[in-house]
């Protein structure tokens, strides 16, 4: 069973305003509404079982006002539907180029870190060389690693290798990458464009 899952959904965004990037995204790959994202992931979970205690990293769009089918709140709702509790946001700071928005240049992209665990327990991340992902009482699993990724932007929507190193340093496998486009050693990639790139 997979203990760490990365999901980079092809969010459907509205045109114009904060969601102007939608037209750009839809020219690269088919996009999905929140309902379609939940349905697709649920189907994959039935084929690739996820452990009862596991970590989830879900990429989202940096917006609270972009509509019900996009943005941070929509992604948090997807986490809830899948049985994961959102814990924190992990920013990817793009060190080479930003994206223009009505509110200024955007140099970040957000990933939600969420967990699934037994009632009354939490799941700690790797720290101090400890590779356990076992349940520990709430508040006992402290992690001293940084909470952001600093890396260059590459092809449209392609996430940096630094992110996957970050995940592997905090969470243990088996690893599942949904809506994957990159073949990566030690990971199971699933998606229509899986294998498009190599790590």
Regions found by a protein language model. Give the residues of each.
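Class I S-adenosyl-L-methionine-dependent methyltransferase catalytic core
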Residues: 1-199
């Amino acid at each position: 069973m997979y203990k760490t899952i990365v999901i980079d959904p092809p969010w459907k965004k509205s045109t114009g305003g904060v969601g102007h990037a939608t037209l750009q995204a839809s020219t690269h790959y088919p996009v999905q509404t929140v309902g379609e994202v939940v349905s697709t992931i649920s189907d994959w979970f039935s084929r690739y079982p996820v452990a009862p205690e596991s970590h989830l990293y879900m990429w989202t769009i940096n917006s609270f006002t972009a509509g019900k089918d996009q943005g941070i709140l929509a992604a948090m709702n997807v986490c809830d539907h899948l049985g994961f509790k959102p814990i924190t946001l992990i920013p990817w700071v793009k060190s080479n180029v930003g994206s223009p928005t009505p509110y200024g240049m955007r140099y970040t992209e957000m990933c939600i870190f969420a967990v699934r665990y037994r009632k009354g327990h939490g799941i700690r991340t790797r720290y101090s060389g400890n590779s356990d992902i076992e349940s520990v009482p709430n508040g006992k699993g402290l992690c001293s690693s940084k909470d952001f990724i600093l890396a260059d932007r590459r092809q449209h929507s392609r996430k940096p290798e630094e992110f996957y190193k970050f995940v592997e340093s905090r969470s243990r496998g088996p690893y599942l990458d949904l809506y994957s486009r990159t073949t990566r050693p030690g990971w199971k990639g699933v998606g229509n464009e899986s294998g498009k790139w190599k790590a």
